[in-house]
């Protein structure tokens, strides 16, 4: 019996007992249909306390891949920061105090929603109050969400921030996350957000609520709000402090590097000295003091396989590449010994509903090449269900599922010939619930379970569990010892 194992993560494809507004159900998916009839599977948890998040908090790709790759429940940053605010210890954080005290003015940049995937509005509000109490002027640079929450609810969150605004706390700029939180090297987008924050360019005469209302009338919703600054804000000045409030790293790497990377050269930047701090480490190659350093787990799945002298391949397209590498490996950037990586570029389109197959064919091809080369362990992420699900376009999400299903069919056929075990699961759901009961478009992740198929002659039954049970399941299939840090397998 072969020990070679393939772990497939179909991002954003979850279980929904209702067929209504369910792109996964609607899609023509012969591979999944075959699996449901012939391969053992169970439903596993991806959210809340099962993955180290607050109770009933939706899961996300960072947390999901960290949990899958480490094989245990990790206390997530959202929970750590919530507790620091609740216990009134955030104000005592040395990095935060030092950054505020040595800066002239404080600029807070963060995603202003309670989605809890990249940030939380309460963190921004708490830091604004702390900086004000330390005698500083505070400028808040709002990034609107529309993706991890409803597409047009920004005013709800902005009103919460307006409640704390006074002579010392001001909303300075606004930008949709499409611009400020790009992660695909679309520097033209990032520049628009950067210019509004740094140079107060452009500037609108509207107040923030009127600006949003005008955007809505023009069919521009929260994710895509055009960056602008507001009256009374004139830009960043020498010796100001910038605090990046998002705790998730992947969508803060670009915008933070523009400010903090000495040799950044994609476009013209502010030349004066500035002070920086970030909630977590975004990029080890760009020095920014960190409020909440990560505790990297030991004996991750990648490490155990490497220590056994076996080969492994991690592959995904750009949008999810960090997840199968950095996050999957427990927050470690460098590959382990005998780990190879294949990055497939994501298509250069404005939004992925325009190309719902994304780069799935190329990703699938990379997997099949690795299988033909008899790589001992392969992990792959298919991004379509999540990235197209986030657009809210139902028909495109259906096509996204169909594109993934086609690639799965080819992979499973080859698995039979090459004697691979396969675990097929997801990090969280999305496209299986595209509207709520009132008919409102949903673009966020779902709070629910996902499928976990285990295709192997060794397996007749799959237990229920959570994402933390995946890594030990891989190791059991590969006939490797499960380290004491990991939880129980599903088989």
Swiss-Prot record:
Gene3D superfamilies reported in the protein's UniProt record: Alkaline Phosphatase, subunit A, BPG-independent phosphoglycerate mutase, domain B
The job of this chain, per UniProt, is described as:
Catalyzes the interconversion of 2-phosphoglycerate and 3-phosphoglycerate.
Spell out the protein name for this chain: 2,3-bisphosphoglycerate-independent phosphoglycerate mutase
Q: Which cofactor does it need?
A: Mn(2+)
| Name of the gene | gpmI
Cofactor annotation remark: Binds 2 manganese ions per subunit.
Pfam families, alphabetized: iPGM_N, Metalloenzyme
Query: From the UniProt record, which GO molecular function terms apply?
Result: manganese ion binding; phosphoglycerate mutase activity
Which residues of the sequence carry a binding annotation for substrate?
118, 147-148, 177, 183, 248-251, 320
The entry sums up its family as follows: Belongs to the BPG-independent phosphoglycerate mutase family.
Give the reactions, separated by semicolons, that this protein catalyses: (2R)-2-phosphoglycerate = (2R)-3-phosphoglycerate
Q: What HAMAP family does its record include?
A: GpmI
